[in-house]
From Swiss-Prot:
It comes from the Bacteria. It is a lipid-anchor. A lipid is attached at C17 (N-palmitoyl cysteine). Residues 83-104 are annotated as: Disordered. This is Flagellar L-ring protein. It comes from Wolinella succinogenes (strain ATCC 29543 / DSM 1740 / CCUG 13145 / JCM 31913 / LMG 7466 / NCTC 11488 / FDC 602W) (Vibrio succinogenes). Its main location: membrane. It is found in: Cell outer membrane; Bacterial flagellum basal body.
Length: 235
């Protein structure tokens, strides 16, 4: 019974102190949901024209323009950060206090002698000496990450202002290791190249996720016991 209570206590402690993995919500931004979709206008070319609108016209713009059209996204993200800090503190203090002194200017010699004896008795001083306190600290942090790949996305909504809300994803399973990639965002049709590609730097409200699942990921993660100790360790 005591063993069961111990396991329950550890599980509750772990669930309460463990830090959840970062997550991304791929829900479209509010303005995308609130903005009406553009009405589809069917246009047909003149009979015999080389610039047709069929499935395989001789000359046509190959860029994505309509709902459910595909566009290739070239993801080329680089993030770098550098920060440094330095702090120096110094403090010095000292104090001295002398004993009291009594003076007498009267004609009585006996009183004068008594005053002198009293001054000799109280001629002491108090000194706290010098107190020095110093602190020096400095720190530097540098970080650089890059991620490059391509993924096809689909036009989910053509908004009233002509912009596209796109969504794409890819899952790859190789030798028990699963790679998952997903992205969403808003693009302008003018930023799509002639080869129907767009760079990720032109995507507004971009949300890009890439993660792996499998034994390799498990082997690089800390055990739950280590996570519990780190979450409650105060030092």
């Amino acid at each position: 019974m005591s063993g069961f209570l111990l396991v329950t206590l550890v599980a509750a402690l772990y669930s309460g102190c463990s830090v959840a993995d970062p997550q991304i919500s791929f829900k479209p931004p509010e303005y995308v949901e609130e903005m009406p979709a553009r009405e589809v206008e069917e246009s047909f070319g003149n009979a015999g024209s080389l610039f047709g609108q069929g499935d395989n016209p001789l000359f046509a713009d190959r860029r994505a323009m309509k709902l459910n059209d595909l566009v290739t996204v070239i993801i080329n993200e680089t993030a770098s950060a550098s920060s440094s800090g330095k702090k120096d503190l110094s403090e010095t203090s000292s104090s001295t206090m002398n004993g009291p002194s009594v003076t007498f200017g009267g004609p009585s010699q006996s009183i004068g002698n008594a005053v002198n004896k009293l001054n000799n008795f109280t001629s002491f001083g108090l000194s706290t000496g010098n107190n020095n306190s110093t602190f020096a600290g400095s720190g530097t942090q540098q970080r650089q990450e890059s991620f490059t790949t391509t993924v096809s996305a689909r036009i989910i909504k053509v908004m009233e202002n002509g912009n596209y809300f796109i969504e794409g994803g890819r899952e790859i399973l190789i030798n028990g290791e699963k790679q998952i990639m997903r992205l969403t965002g808003v693009i302008r049709p003018y930023d799509i190249g002639r080869n129907n590609t767009i760079n990720s730097r032109y995507i507004a409200d971009a949300k890009i996720m890439y993660e792996t699942q499998g034994e390799i990921k498990k082997s690089t993660e800390k055990g739950w016991g280590t996570k519990v100790l780190e979450s409650v360790w105060p030092f």
